[in-house]
Amino acid sequence: MTQKIIIFDTTLRDGEQSLKMSLSVKKKLKIAFALEKLGVDVIEAGFPISSPGDFESVKKISERIKDAKICSLARCIDGDIDIAAKAMKKANSFRIHIFLGTSALHVQSKLKKTFDQIIDMMVSSVKRAQKYTDDVEFSCEDAGRTSLDDLCRIIELAIDLGVKTINIPDTVGYTIPYEFSNIISSIYKKVPNIDKAIISVHCHDDLGMAVANSISAIQVGARQIEGTITGVGERAGNAALEEILMAIKIRKDILNFKTNIKYQEIYSTCRVISSICNIPVPVNKAIIGSNAFSHSSGIHQDGILKDKKTYEIIVPESIGFVSQPLNLTSRSGRAAVKYRMKKIGYKDSDYNIDILYSRFLKLADKKGRVSDSDLKQLVCFNNKLKNLKD
């Protein structure tokens, strides 16, 4: 049976942490509307205690968004939880997301606590959050470097308290896929009440493993993925949701999952967020880069002209991307030149392909990319020479 993966977007919270300046309420609302249109299940709208501006943004988003659950982050501090609930009180549906460091490094060096004290803080904060909603998510910060015994202990207690979602973050992007999937598998084996909660994952990209780690986690039981559009996020960024979503869609033979995502909105959503956040999309970015569906090799262009599936595993239009003409460069073959000539209105009898292609290569070597206008001029020049000879 195909199982659903919950898509939890944290572009407005974790993603914004990568920006040099805070986004205005108006810009955050625009992003939230784009995410709602995309079809994400949960929008983590912000961290309300962090600033009056963030509180106002979460409040406005909670009032306006109707088709996605709104979530706010809070530390295991009563004041944080109270403010998070206050910001979301007009939401159709909301979740309070509390987090606490669980690795020895975080417990001892950052929090200056014992693990028993961490347990007590979690218990108190879960109960506090449950005064406002029965939808509470608990994150074991730095789970990737937390001992398995400690991790399973705190997870079991949180689920006993009624926590519905347990998030396993690879906070500093430390793990590799085999290791991260083993953590998730071990949680399922060692936590007796695990069937009463959803396991979520939240991966960072410090070693370039965020997407791979997220995919490896759902293969062994995780049912919520947290990430950001374009992978924007603190340091090296978060798991890029568009990459995860397309992996699920394209590799259904291995990843037998479904989501609520409207795939045709992926490209426009990414471009909207890139523009608002003023973060350019690299040309070779998977799924949404300007080169993602371009082909310059003559062999590849010939294959594409015969059957696009030879070199494209994604139909560009399926994500809302309008296919671009083949780029004609010195690497292009005769087939690509003939195809382009036909597209701009020429018949094979209008020109000699051998002569045209020879001149095309010389021009391409000089200027790089050859345009439709260039091709027309080459034909015109060739015809003039022919007339002179005649």
UniProtKB/Swiss-Prot annotation:
Please report which protein family the annotation says this sequence is part of. Answer: Belongs to the alpha-IPM synthase/homocitrate synthase family. LeuA type 1 subfamily.
Protein name listed in UniProt: Putative 2-isopropylmalate synthase
Per the UniProt entry, what species is this protein from, by scientific name? Answer: Buchnera aphidicola subsp. Baizongia pistaciae (strain Bp)
Q: Taking every annotated instance into account, which residue ranges of this chain make up the domain Pyruvate carboxyltransferase?
A: 5-267
Q: Name the pathway it acts in.
A: Amino-acid biosynthesis; L-leucine biosynthesis; L-leucine from 3-methyl-2-oxobutanoate: step 1/4
Designated gene of the protein: leuA
Q: Which CDD domains match?
A: DRE_TIM_IPMS
According to the lineage, what is the superkingdom? Bacteria
User: Could you tell me the Gene Ontology terms of the biological process aspect for this record?
Assistant: L-leucine biosynthetic process
InterPro entries in the record, alphabetically? 2-IPM_HCS-like, AIPM/Hcit_synth_CS, Aldolase_TIM, LeuA/HCS_post-cat, LeuA_bact_synth, PYR_CT
Q: Which reaction does it catalyse?
A: 3-methyl-2-oxobutanoate + acetyl-CoA + H2O = (2S)-2-isopropylmalate + CoA + H(+)
Gene Ontology CC annotations of this record: cytosol
